[in-house]
C-alpha cells in the first residue's frame, strides 16, 4: 500500500516542481516591490512607535527577501533567456530597480533594530546592483528601444528614481556606522539625491507628456502609475534624511536651505498627484468597468502609500510643521489596509492558479475519461 502511495506521490511532486519552474521562468521582475511595500509599512509603524506591528512586518520580510532573491538567482541560472528578454525590454528593464529599493528598505529595517553589519552589507549590495542597472538600463533605452514616440513611457520607469533615493535613505544611516568613511558617504548621499531628482525631472516630464497629451486607455492606467507619487515621496524623505543627518561638512551645511526648499516642493508635488491618481482609478474601474484583479504590480501601488506616510511624518520633524505629523500618522491607516487587501488577493490568486494547474494536469492524465453528469 505504501508503494502505491509513493507511486501516486511521485507524479504529483513532479507536477508541482514543473509548476514552480514555470512560475520561476515567468517571474515578474518587479516582484521585490512586495518587500518594498512590507518594509516601508514596517518602518512607518516603527517611527510611529507601534513596535509590535512593525516587528511582524519585519519578520515577513526576513522570510520574503531571501525567497525572492533565491527565485531571481534560480531564474538567472535556469531561465537565462527569459531573464535577458526582460532586461532587454525597455518597458520592463526599470522594474529590476525594485531589487535595489527592496534591499535598502530591508537594510533600514535592520538598522532600526541595531543590526549595523547587516545594513552595511545590504547597502553595498544595493549600491553595486544600482550602479550596474543604471548604465545597463540606459544602454537598453538608447540602443534597443524601437518605439518612436512616448508610448513606451510608463510609471514603472520611475522605480529607477525610487531605487536611487533608497540608497540615500540607507546610506545616511550607514554613515553613522562607518565613521572613517562618514564624510564621504554623506557627500555621496547628497550626490545620489541630486541624481535622483534629475532623473525624476526627466522621466516625469516624459510621463506627463504621455499621460496628458496622448489618448489614454484603461490599460495605460496600471498600478505602476502610483510610482509617480511614490518617487516624489521618497525624494522628499531622502531630502529630510539629509537635513536630519547632522553632517558637519561646511559646504553641505550651507546647502541645507536649498535641500529644505526642494524637499517641500517634491513633497507638495507628490501630494498633488494623489487625488488625480484616485480619479484615474475611478475612471478605469467604475466608468470603464474594468474589474479589479490581482497582479504583482499592485505592490507598486502599496509602497507609495506607505512611503508617503513616512515622508510626511519625517518631513514634519525637519520642517517643524506639526500638522504634517498628524497627516503622516493618519495616512498609514490607508497603507496598512491596502497591504492587507493586496496580500489576501495575492494568496487567493496563487491558490487559484495552483488549483487550475492541478485540474489541467488531472485532465491530461485521463484523456479518455468523459466528464460525469
PLM features per residue range, with description:
Residues 2-73, 78:
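N-terminal signal-anchor module of multipass membrane proteins
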Residues 17-34, 85-93, 142-164, 192, ...:
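Cytoplasm-facing juxtamembrane segments at the starts of transmembrane helices
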Residues 24-45, 95-106, 155-173, 228-241, ...:
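The first (N-terminal) embedded transmembrane alpha-helix
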Residues 37, 42-43, 67-71, 75, ...:
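C-terminal transmembrane-bundle signature of multipass membrane proteins
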Residues 51-126:
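Membrane helical hairpin/interfacial module
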Residues 56-69, 119-132, 187-200, 263-272, ...:
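Structural signature of hydrophobic alpha-helical transmembrane segments
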Residues 84-91, 108-164, 169-193, 214-218:
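Membrane-interface helix-loop-helix junctions at boundaries between adjacent transmembrane segments
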Residues 160-280:
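Generic multipass alpha-helical transmembrane bundles of integral membrane proteins
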